Every structure is written in structure tokens, then in C-alpha cells.
Amino acid sequence: MSTAVQVDDVMRYRDSRFQTIAAKLLPTQYLVVDDDTALTTTLGSCVAACLRDPVLKIGGMNHFLLPKGQVGDGAPTRYGSYAMELLINDMLKRGAHRKRIEAKVFGGANVLKGFTSNPVGTRNAEFVRQYLQAEHIPIIAEDLCGIHPRKVWFFATTGRVVVQRLPHAHEAEVAATESAVRARLSKAPVTGGVELFE
């Protein structure tokens, strides 16, 4: 059974490429599934972590915009630190074992103009690597940084990931979408909480 536990509903559609139902995650969203749903997202400087318990065959994906933020700084799910906790905790609630969780991480492209000295994409990529290392969750595959936006499909039951690097023509569109979400979220009130599991 697939359920979105975030306030915003995740859009589902029939993916003709893979002949399955796909759930499209937007920035700040995450989803955990235990069926054949393809989790998909489009990434520029944002990062998506795909986590999986290979024994239980459940997994999830998140999509975050920035590594860390301050409490009271708008929607907390835009920050990797919060988005990672939500994803891990949801998997643990569904029976995943922390020691079996493995990760595949994607995104962190440097597509936002004006961030040349400390690019958001690079910071996001560094954050997700450091976070997973600190949590003792191995990264078994990654496609991070670079200059190209990506579209990612993750199949939790098998662990398969398909990454399509998008041509330069998509950079402006992806960057504009990410910037618009950042602007909207900077005005959003803080909601929700995190329950930590040891």
C-alpha cells in the first residue's frame, strides 16, 4: 500500500515508458512505497535520496531544496536534514531495519545562476553524503553534481533506478521551478514535527 504522509498530495499518473503507476514528487515532498509504484522527480540543484530496505522490499524518495535551515524558517521539508529524518522514520515505522537501509542519491547540479562561489547543488550533494555517512547508511549508487538537470525513476521493490540527464534546454525551466518553490516556501508557516527512532 502506498500512502503519502505529507500534507501535500503526491501526484500519481500512468507512466507509459515503464507501464506502471508513477508518483511524481515535487520539491519538499517524500513518499514511501511497498509496491510497484515508480517514484519519480526532476532535479536541478535539489537532491533526491532513494532509500530502500532490500529484505522488506520497501523504499522511499524525498526531494529537498537546501541542506539545512533555521527553526521557524518556513516549510521544514525543504531542508535535507528534516526531509531525511521524515523519510527514514517513515520507513522504520513500516518495519524497515536501520542496519539494512541502503541509499541511492541524485541531483545537486549547479543550474542556478548567481551561486558560483558556493553553489546550492554542491552544498546539497555534500550534505546528503555527510548525512548518510553519519547515519551509517551506505550509498550504493549516486549521480550528483555536474551541470545537467536529471529526471529520476526509483522502483522501491527492486531497487532499480533510471536516470535521464536532461538537455541544457531544460536548465532554465528546472531552475525557475526550484526558485519559485524557494520563494513560496520562504513565506510558509512552519508545520509538522519529527519523531526520532533509535
Curated annotation (Swiss-Prot):
GO terms for molecular function: protein-glutamine glutaminase activity. Disulfide bonds: none annotated. Transmembrane segments: none annotated. Keywords: Chemotaxis, Hydrolase. One of its GO terms (biological process) is chemotaxis. It is an enzyme of class 3 (hydrolase). Pfam families: CheD. The keyword Lipoprotein does not apply. Its EC number is 3.5.1.44. It catalyses: L-glutaminyl-[protein] + H2O = L-glutamyl-[protein] + NH4(+). Probably deamidates glutamine residues to glutamate on methyl-accepting chemotaxis receptors (MCPs), playing an important role in chemotaxis. Belongs to the CheD family. This is Probable chemoreceptor glutamine deamidase CheD. It comes from Xanthomonas euvesicatoria pv. vesicatoria (strain 85-10). The gene is cheD.
